[in-house]
């Protein structure tokens, strides 16, 4: 199955906050990409910042991170119900089995149960390169260093709140081997930026059961040998390394890819 690459007109880029730079992170963003406002998704990913008993990924958002499916399911009129694995947290970190006391649910774990050090300094999975960063500036620097250019763009999901039934309207390919940056579910602002080889990112246009139109950033893994075998079998009844497996990316994350267009709004 072939998917059209995103065109300038159809490209789904992050929503922007149309405000003048008034904070250090906004000033830094403007220094890299002048006249391009800080995207709203990044503002949302930075909230809350150190607030007591306040985590960035709310309970109603968990199903955004707990849906596995096959690549051939990405076609118009396909129905999806979010959440097809009992291990809700595992889909956030689906690449490795539990080891050395570090569980797959680390991204959704309470900080008293797991520490950031457990996650950030744990061994990488097969074909994975990862870095933990503690600010938007560090994320930008890391991604620019990775691609060797500021001509890049970021793409995110905008799942509708309290909706878990969707129908696919359209599928657009974003690119291969994107760098994903996820907000970890701790009060302290920390992002996990990682790239897994042999992956393809898509933007999937969805219509919720109440008629709301949304976009879902989606990643398909063509090499699943580094994924959690129990998770794969639980959700899809397949074994490692047999077929491509995909999952949605929730609202508190972004994919960075090279920008080959001339559309300034997407040069971020």
Swiss-Prot record:
Residues 166-222 are annotated as: 2 X approximate repeats. Residues 1-22 form the signal peptide. It comes from the Eukaryota. InterPro entries: BURP, BURP_dom. Residues 50-106 are annotated as: 3 X 6 AA approximate repeats. It holds the Pfam family BURP. Glycans are attached at residue 259. Seed. Keywords: Glycoprotein, Repeat, Signal. SMART domains: BURP. Residues 68-259 form the BURP domain. Sequence repeats lie at residues 50-55, 83-88, 101-106, 166-183, 202-222. PANTHER family: ABUNDANT PROTEIN, PUTATIVE-RELATED, BURP DOMAIN PROTEIN USPL1-LIKE. This is Embryonic abundant protein USP87. It comes from Vicia faba (Broad bean).
């Amino acid at each position: 199955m072939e998917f059209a690459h995103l065109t300038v007109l159809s490209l789904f880029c992050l929503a922007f906050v149309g405000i003048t730079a008034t904070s250090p992170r906004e000033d830094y963003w403007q220094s890299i990409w002048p006249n391009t406002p800080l995207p709203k998704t990044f503002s949302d990913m930075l909230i809350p910042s150190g607030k007591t008993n306040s985590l960035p990924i709310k309970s109603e958002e968990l199903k955004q991170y707990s849906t596995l499916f096959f690549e051939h399911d990405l076609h118009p009129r396909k129905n999806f119900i979010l959440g097809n694995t009992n291990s809700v947290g595992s889909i956030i970190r689906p690449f490795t089995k539990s080891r050395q006391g570090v569980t797959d649910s680390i991204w959704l774990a309470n900080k008293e149960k797991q520490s950031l050090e457990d996650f950030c300094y744990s061994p990488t999975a097969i074909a994975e390169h990862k870095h933990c960063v503690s600010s938007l500036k560090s994320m930008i620097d890391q991604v620019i260093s990775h691609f060797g250019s500021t001509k890049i763009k970021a793409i995110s999901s905008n799942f509708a709140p309290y909706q878990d039934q969707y129908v696919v309207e359209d599928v657009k390919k974003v690119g291969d081997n994107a760098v994903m940056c996820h907000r970890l579910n701790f009060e302290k602002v920390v992002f996990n930026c990682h790239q897994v080889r042999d992956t393809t990112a898509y933007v999937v246009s969805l219509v919720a059961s109440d008629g709301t139109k949304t976009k879902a950033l989606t990643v398909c893994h063509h090499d699943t040998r580094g994924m959690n075998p129990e998770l794969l079998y639980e959700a899809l009844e397949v074994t490692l390394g047999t077929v491509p497996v995909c999952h949605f990316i929730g609202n508190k994350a972004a994919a960075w890819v090279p920008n080959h267009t001339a559309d300034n709004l997407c040069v971020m």
